[in-house]
Design a protein with these regions (language model features):
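Helix-to-loop junction immediately C-terminal to a conserved catalytic motif
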Residues: 65
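Conserved catalytic motifs of ABC-family nucleotide-binding domains
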Residues: 168
Length: 261
């Protein structure tokens, strides 16, 4: 069974221009964030969602996590419909959240992770093992006993990833996970993600980074202005330059953020 299945999923954001809000009028517009998107993600597979800002990558992840719900179409995670069975879906999904408000500032990184691991009602021994693994996998071992209130924004990002990993999810959602990591930590993190996928986890990675997609992904989804333009496997040894050229052929343009990586 596929872990994630999109069938003609559409997401629309309705809004009113500031002028009409100020005037108290109802006139406004809408933005179609996803346009009838269909794809699936299997267990033990890493999917890279590649596209510029506004392409629909983050919306896709939020729909899988049930932070948003589809306006049309069907989305199933682990066989559960995200509209009807949101609670069942959330039990299976881990999503990396880097916000300071997601953690207890006066607890250490280790203590925060222990709290979230305990929500799964696992033994203390199992929690210790999980926490040691995710601290190593995200390069936070040296900061395990540092109060979270002292963390930099980059460390918060890594702690958000660690929180998602400690849950041992069936589906892991990552949004630009390595943007604040140095090269060594990034390489180690990619190894961690590949190992996690081999444990039957479906990983969906939203990224601007061609090198990241080439290093870690099994399949590539190209999103552009809410449309899914391509869904194909990566060839063994396919380079970042090859992915960049493919993206250009599919979209006819390259976003500046994508050119730089």
């Amino acid at each position: 069974m596929d872990s994630v299945v999109f069938e003609s999923v559409r997401k629309v954001f309705r809004h009113r221009p500031a002028l009409f809000n100020w005037l108290g009028r109802e006139r406004g517009g809408e933005t179609i964030a996803l346009k009838d998107v269909s794809f699936s993600a299997a267990r033990a597979e890493v999917l890279a969602l590649l596209g510029p800002n506004g392409s629909g990558k983050t919306t896709t992840l939020k729909l899988i996590s049930t932070m948003l719900l589809p306006d049309a179409g069907t989305l199933r995670v682990g066989g559960f419909d995200t509209r009807r069975d949101a609670g069942q879906v959330r039990r299976q999904v881990g999503i990396a959240i880097a916000s300071e408000r997601s953690f207890f500032p006066r607890l250490s990184a280790r203590e925060n992770l222990d709290f979230f691991a305990a929500l799964d009602e696992v033994s203390r021994r199992e929690r210790r093992q999980r926490i040691a693994e995710v601290l190593a996998g995200t390069g936070l071992e040296e900061h395990a006993d540092t109060l979270v209130m002292k963390f930099s924004s980059g460390m918060y990002q890594r702690l958000g990833i660690a929180r998602a990993l400690v849950k041992r999810p069936n589906v892991l959602l990552l949004d630009e996970p390595t943007r604040s990591m140095d090269a060594a930590t990034t390489a180690h993190f990619w190894t961690t993600i590949r190992a996690l996928a081999r444990q039957q986890t479906a990983v969906l990675l939203a990224t601007h980074n061609f090198a990241e997609a080439a290093a870690v992904a099994d399949r590539l989804l190209v999103l552009h202005r809410g449309e899914l333009l391509a869904d194909r496997p990566l060839r063994e040894g396919e380079s970042a330059d090859a992915l960049r050229a493919f993206y250009f052929r599919m979209t006819g343009e390259i976003d500046e953020a994508l050119v730089r990586v």
